[in-house]
Amino acid sequence: MKLGINTLLFLFMVTVESFGANPTWSTSIANIIYSNCSSCHRYGGIAPFSLMNYDEVVAKKNSVLEAVTTRSMPPYPADTKFRSYSHQRNLSDSDINAFVEWVNNGAPAGDLASAPNPPTFSSGPIIKNPNFTAEMPFYASQAKAGGEDEYRCFVLDGSPTKDEFISAIEVIPGNPEIVHHVLVFQDTSSIPLQLDAQTSEPGYPGFGGVGSNTAELIGVYAPGGEPYFFPKGFGLRFRKGARIIVQVHYPAGTEGQMDFTSVRFNYSDAVSPREVFIDPLLNHQNIVNKPFRIPAGQEKTFTQRMTIPIDATAFAVMPHMHLIGKSTKIILRMPNNDTIPIINIPHWDFHWQMAYTFKTLQKVPKGSILESTVIYDNTSENPHNPSSPPKEVRVGEGTTDEMMLTYFYYCQYQSGDELITTEVQDDSPIDMPLTDITFMQIQDGVIVKFPGQIAVHSLRIYDVLGGIVHDQQSNHRHQHSSLTIPISISGTYFMHAIDADGKQYTGRFSIMR
């Protein structure tokens, strides 16, 4: 394979910059912090201190060092070596090693004049002209310092007059400093209103759910999260007459602080939107080793299996357990007995629940089997156990009860679904049409051809499972009209690149050996 001199120089600089010794704030640490920490660690964010500039990070460098080396921060419970996901917030081994080396070397600043600018965060909603909006009433958190977190459900005003299809959903925390996470449901029954009427304050308590068997999960918010955009042409049914219920998590120590969280929806403009469903396909009915009981003082492992009755397409996965959940691992067993990783959460944290979106849509063939292995720890050694001493635990929505559910976002499969990427959302500034980028296979890889000279800031290649097979970053402004990427394994791949001006480029290609 012949490489142009510019390409060789570019790859050399990327290698030196990414893996060279003596990282500084300006060359690498700032990008790591801004990309993974600052969305929460900023003034007005939910984190307890800001990490928005060199001085702030140096002042907290030891705390940050402990958090990143123990992988307690950023909070992203899924094992991304098992499978990677869109918009994931976790540090690579090289990121962690760079931060450790930076601290050990005295946290050098480098050339601050060349350091990247801090990120800017919108103070308002991203969905500017929603088709539907609803707000909860003003509410003062009752979560006392040193006490328990509060989980409260609110029934929001407003309902659609006919069935609509939601193409985008945004949760806007009224007080980002106290809203830990939000689950969004719709319900056509009157049960949530009845529960709401039983309390004098706005809303009603709800730890494990919203108290209605007919409520349907439609959205999730966690700190630093962005609106959820379904790929074009897809939508989630918003039922005529349905009310929106939000379950809001307020951490202990927020007592007396006010919140007024709201939600915004955009509706699909497709003539016939493809309907997306969110259902707990793995649930208490398909537990293999029933009954679902966890004896006091024991760890217990359960397995679920579900045979898929149709060809389906999966967008995202969201496991759900309560406080004695320890771990969950899910695979897809194909009809030919091959296995595909879906999700692995080795250390379950009830307080950090989220939906994990596949980087490319996952085909789930008819006859394949979803299979989970879930462990519960009902011992006194579990610091999250709500009962002391431990008591037998069964299914239920209460604090001392448990659940074993995994929600999937899915639809009926159509040919080509597995080529649809979710890495770039509909509101992202995709400046170059897909046809403007071409790919040419060569003996040892592929040549990516851009329509003109661009300064590549970052370029990643993903496989069909969302795994990163090539990653290069650069702070230099060297211009390229093409880049050569070494890839030796046959398959379909997806490219996402960003130039020095923030323009984004996407494309897909196949390698045949």
Residue ranges and their predicted role:
Residues G20-F154, V246-Q247:
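Aromatic- and Gly/Pro-enriched helix-to-coil junctions and flexible linker segments
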Residues D431-R513:
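C-terminal outer-membrane/trafficking sorting elements
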Residues D55, Y250, V374-Y376, G452, ...:
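A mature extracytoplasmic/lumenal domain signature
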